[in-house]
């Protein structure tokens, strides 16, 4: 599998996580919606499914790792930055085959693509703290 297939899977997964956070819909319904309504050519669909379901089912564990490093109330973090942080923290914690530098870099790129102007700096800072680099 090409790395770009995983990159595309992450990109779609962060959008699905964002949608799930805002809608409160069942994660299986969100997955079905994204796989039927989005262009999925060249995407590692199995990885997309794992990222989405893993992030949803392990949300409490993931948030426990994120929250101590945020200096404002968690509910004030933008939904897209929260989606990126959750996805990256899932990879950092549960996908030991993904080097932490790859997970962080991919998260920064997602935050640049979807987040606020300096959102990528916020995401980078939090993820660096999670992996113990700061």
UniProtKB/Swiss-Prot annotation:
CDD domains from the UniProt entry: Terminator_NusB
Keyword Transcription regulation part of the UniProt annotation: yes
Keyword Lipid metabolism: no
Pfam families per record: NusB
GO cellular component annotations of the record: cytosol
UniProt keywords, alphabetically: RNA-binding, Transcription, Transcription antitermination, Transcription regulation
InterPro entries given in the database record: NusB-like_sf (IPR035926), NusB_fam (IPR011605), NusB_RsmB_TIM44 (IPR006027)
One of the GO biological process terms: DNA-templated transcription termination
MF (Gene Ontology): RNA binding
Domain of life of the organism encoding this protein: Bacteria
NCBIfam families the record matches: nusB
Function: Involved in transcription antitermination. Required for transcription of ribosomal RNA (rRNA) genes. Binds specifically to the boxA antiterminator sequence of the ribosomal RNA (rrn) operons.
Family membership: Belongs to the NusB family.
Protein name per Swiss-Prot or TrEMBL: Transcription antitermination protein NusB
Organism: Shewanella sediminis (strain HAW-EB3)
């Amino acid at each position: 599998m090409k790395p770009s297939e995983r990159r595309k899977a992450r990109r779609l997964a962060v959008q699905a996580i964002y949608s799930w956070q805002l809608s409160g819909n069942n994660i299986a319904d969100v997955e079905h919606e994204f796989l039927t309504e989005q262009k999925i050519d060249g995407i590692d669909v199995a990885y997309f499914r794992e990222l989405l379901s893993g992030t949803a089912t392990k949300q409490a564990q993931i948030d426990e790792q994120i929250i101590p490093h945020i200096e404002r109330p968690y509910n004030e973090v933008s939904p897209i930055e929260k989606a990126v942080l959750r996805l990256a923290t899932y990879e950092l914690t549960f996908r030991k085959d993904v080097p932490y530098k790859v997970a962080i870099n991919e998260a920064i790129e997602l935050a640049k693509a979807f987040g606020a102007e300096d959102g990528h700096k916020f995401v980078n800072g939090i993820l660096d703290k999670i992996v113990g680099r700061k």
